[in-house]
Amino acid sequence: MATPIGNLEDITLRAINTLKSVDIIAAEDTRHTLKLLNHLEIKKKLISYHRHNEEIKSKMLIDILLEGKDIALVSDAGTPAISDPGEEIVKQAIENKIDIIPIPGACALINALIVSGISTAEFSFYGFLPLNKKNRKEKIEEIKKESKTIILYEAPHKLLSTLKDISNALGEETNIVLAKEITKIHEEFIRGRIGDIINKMENVKGEFIIIIDNKQEKNENDNISNQISLDEQYERYKTSGLTKKEIIKKIAKERNVSKNEIYQYFLKK
């Protein structure tokens, strides 16, 4: 069941009625959910259900459901199972032929996407990037191959390093939107080229959604890569009077790779 991301007025009438009618509420953080229940003047039994106890608690909650009781599953904010606990109990409920009823509502990634100005026709959601360096690099390489809008979540203390990793892989000319503290008091949308945004970032606070325009001239760039070599492309721009720095920047953008990658190629020649 979805709950507000930040603005309590985003709770739906159906969600309120559901919270009132169920026997138990399984919450990611019972203290956080208790604040919402107090605001709504609802008193219910709360059971902790988070990432670290998801497997054990799922079995316990399934037993309760099999007794004929109703449970509402909520995360701290937004929709459960979207970068939050919930997937495991849904699987187990299906295996036990227990009815699952979605109670729709706020979802941070969707709300950020629809006001981003970036294509909503096709998109891939990657949640939070892995912490492990190898896994992180592999995931970014996977993103690099996509030709659709990309959506990520990121915490404030890791935002700058994540933006730099994305910039190195996709190019600093890549257009992005940062949705900060969506639906909250300090909601803000930062739009522009990733290189420019990185240079302006300071005193980073709040939760962020990163939306990447990963469809920019993708097909055209792929054709360039397939048709001519880097050396041929370099010579074409050289005859037009561009400097080496300008040529490297232009090739990197057209091939959707980092400037450093192109620079290293010509350095070895």
Positions of PLM-derived features:
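Short active-site oxyanion
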Residues: L19-I25, I98-I101, T149-I150
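A contiguous loop/helix-start segment that scaffolds small-molecule binding in enzyme catalytic cores
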Residues: T149, Y153-K269
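Conserved helicase motor
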Residues: Y49-E55, L129-N132
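Short glycine-cluster motifs
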Residues: E67-P130
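Short glycine-rich anion-binding loops that position phosphate/pyrophosphate groups of nucleotides
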Residues: I5-L8, D76-P80, P156-K158, K215-E217
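General beta-strand structural signal in soluble alpha/beta enzymes
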Residues: A27, P102-G105, L152, L178
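Glycine-rich, flexible N-terminal cofactor/catalytic loop recognition
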Residues: M1-R51
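A short, charged helix-loop
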Residues: S124-K145
